[in-house]
Amino acid sequence: MGSSSSTQHHFAFQNAEKAFKAAALIQRWYRRYMARLEMRRRCTWNIFQSIEYAGQQDQVKLHEFFSYLVDHFTPSSHHERDFLNRMFTEERFAQDVETEEGGDFESIEVPDSYTGPRLSFPLLPDHATALVEAFRLRQQLHARYVLNLLYETRKHLAQLPNINRVSTCYSEEVTVCGDLHGQLDDLIFIFYKNGLPSPERAYVFNGDFVDRGKDSVEVLMVLFAFMLVYPKEFHLNRGNHEDHLVNLRYGFTKEVMHKYKIHGKKILRTLQDVFCWLPLATLVDEKVLVLHGGVSDKTDLELLAKLDRHKIVSTMRCKTRKESENREEQKRKDNQTSSGQKPTPWFLPQSRSLPSSPFHLGSGFKAYKAGRSCSIPCGSPNSKELSRRGQVRRSVDLELEQCRQQAGFLGIREKGESLPLAPDADCVADGGGVLEPTPEEWKQVVDILWSDPAAQEGCKANAVRGGGCYFGPDVTERLMEKYKLQLLIRSHECKPEGYEFCHNRKVLTIFSASNYYEVGSNRGAYVKLGPALTPHIVQYQANKATHRLTMRQRISRVEESALRALRQKLFAHSSDLLVEFRKRDPDESGVITLSDWATAVESVLHLGLPWRMLRPQLVNSSADNVLEYRSWLDSLAKEQLSRENIQSSLLEKLYRNRSNLETIFRIIDSDHSGFISLDEFRQTWKLFSSHMSIDITDDGICDLARSIDFNKDGHIDINEFLEAFRLVEQSCLEGHASACLQSTDTAESGHSSPGPC
């Protein structure tokens, strides 16, 4: 019996040992599997974010390019000055505001056939609820009600302080929501899950209501309606996308003009004014600060509370003060003119190398950008520097004016008539006054709308976005101590889980647009604050399709979308990549190492991605650890050409520049009609030709416009604009090929070649 019992124990021990080993093996496999999935998820996330931030940098560069042109162009008439003002500031004349406030929307008739929601003011809770239901059923609000709602919203916002105060004493809880970006499904889901706004349920929406999503108009209308119904319980903060210049690139302007073709211009003009009146931050129980982006080491809540926020029309363009002319500087400029030299602003080199296009910026533009009085990064000039620049600028304007008069281009101005200033000098205020935000005020607003937290100590310029700052834990700690705060809630950044704590849990990022990059890419979230101010976070996925996917399926789907976008980015820079590959192939063997491939790709795209980890998804495996780069570039071209029947080199240009071209089109289309008129084309061409030494008559400009107007309807639409760009690129490529062939023939005949093609 004893022997039998010991044998049974021995076998039981062996079985248990095998079971433990099997469990450990399964656990190890599972952990490896989950680690690989997490690595894929993080790489995918980095791809999406890098491409998004690269687009923001392109927006800043494009705007700087147009600012460069406008800042060095003196209009020859009030008509030209008004056009340039509309390009960037959409000047709000007092008489327009008075007309709108006087009920201009009442002249818009609502037809009997209209079946959408109807509004009457003052709004009641049932009106706002009906609006949500109508939008859920994909009904559209009539332009009359849109304008009426916007006018009432503007009147309400104008009465609010820059920093709203919310107390949990009057509401059971305060719900803070982050970016929505035109995703109506997320807004409806929040109301469904958390409840509609009420006196017991306060809401704070933390900016970025518009752009990127397809329902930005509907999101705005719902938010504005509930704010009017519950003015004490429903609060809105301004985000960096509540900006008409940002809207030109990211879709909101296009959406408004598509949905409201007749009254879209008036709606956009009113929205620009409404955005300027949005409060900048919200304080909950004086302990929790809610703002869109973040803070900097210079953030001053007292200054933010008392500045005139309506002056900040756009955070993309700082408006400097007008200064009196400097006589000594004027005398020096006059001497230059008498000697036949063209006046050059002080911050440009005397050779004045001008940018030929917003896609290839020259040294002159770089010097200009380095010397601009107000650019988006952290630093800002002092008052003496601004004064000197204003004086130089005025002297240049005077000097150019004299040149025009001497050349007979302008009639003698009437006595007392002032010289026109460049459009960034001022913005016309109600009553004819001048709105002049100081650089310090402008920087305060830029910092709270554009900044991001960082793990490193200190505060530095946010070069990734092109605006605001990176602020470290020490900056957060000093702000908390100074204003006796316990939590900073911000948005502005998409997070995989919809939220993220940092800086010792004193900074909370909330992002409410789920599936932001792709279906399944991220969750949305909102945070609830009770009297104890303990954050309670709720996560969600507004798209039901993601609920049926496994984690592996969801990551694979998002990864495929990210890699497709990355391959498009690589194809758009094929020419630059080929140049870099050749530098690393001195023997012209046609192959480079995979390590050189990764280095070359990063040097061209500057996306900061882990290219060696992404290599298996982008490059076919090679036993020799080398890559035939020409065949790889050809494979990228074939993938894109399968979707577009266009020559590879031309398609590359369109892929690279389409967003910039569409933004340029909307900038030139200053009245938001969806077309470039002959007058808009003429004024823009004068702007370019004046700085590129191109002599062309008005008849020549008209002929050029007619050549672009392919369907001869009297104006240029976006398709004609892009087609003209394609044809110009094609002719340039054909001319380049012809020049190469000619230089080759010359070299073969024994003569020296003028240089490489």
Curated annotation (Swiss-Prot):
Cofactor, how bound (note): Binds 2 manganese ions per subunit.
Binding positions for Mn(2+) 2 per the UniProt entry: 208, 240, 292, 492
Domain EF-hand: 572-607, 656-691, 696-731
Residues that coordinate or bind Ca(2+) 1: 585, 587, 589, 596
Amino acids binding Mn(2+) 1: 179, 181, 208
Cofactor(s) listed: Mn(2+)
Active-site annotation: 241 (proton donor)
UniProt region (Catalytic), positions on chain: 128-544
GO molecular function, one term: protein serine/threonine phosphatase activity
InterPro entries, A to Z: Calcineurin-like_PHP_ApaH, EF-hand-dom_pair, EF_Hand_1_Ca_BS, EF_hand_dom, Metallo-depent_PP-like, PPP_dom, PPP_phosphatase, Ser/Thr-Pase_EF-hand_contain
Keywords of this entry: Calcium, Hydrolase, Manganese, Metal-binding, Protein phosphatase, Repeat, Sensory transduction, Vision
Activation and inhibition: Activated by calcium.
Span list, region Disordered: 318-349
Catalytic activity: O-phospho-L-seryl-[protein] + H2O = L-seryl-[protein] + phosphate; O-phospho-L-threonyl-[protein] + H2O = L-threonyl-[protein] + phosphate
Cited Pfam families: EF-hand_7, Metallophos, PPP5
Stored PROSITE patterns: EF_HAND_1, EF_HAND_2, IQ, SER_THR_PHOSPHATASE
Binding positions for Ca(2+) 3 per the UniProt entry: 709, 711, 713, 715, 720
Gene Ontology process terms (BP): cellular response to hydrogen peroxide; detection of stimulus involved in sensory perception; negative regulation of apoptotic signaling pathway; negative regulation of MAPK cascade; visual perception
EC number: 3.1.3.16
Basic and acidic residues: compositionally biased ranges: 321-335
Sites where the protein binds Ca(2+) 2: 669, 671, 673, 680
Family assignment from sequence similarity: Belongs to the PPP phosphatase family.
Record function comment: May play a role in phototransduction. May dephosphorylate photoactivated rhodopsin. May function as a calcium sensing regulator of ionic currents, energy production or synaptic transmission.
Full protein name: Serine/threonine-protein phosphatase with EF-hands 2
Phylogenetic placement of the source organism: Eukaryota, Metazoa, Chordata, Craniata, Vertebrata
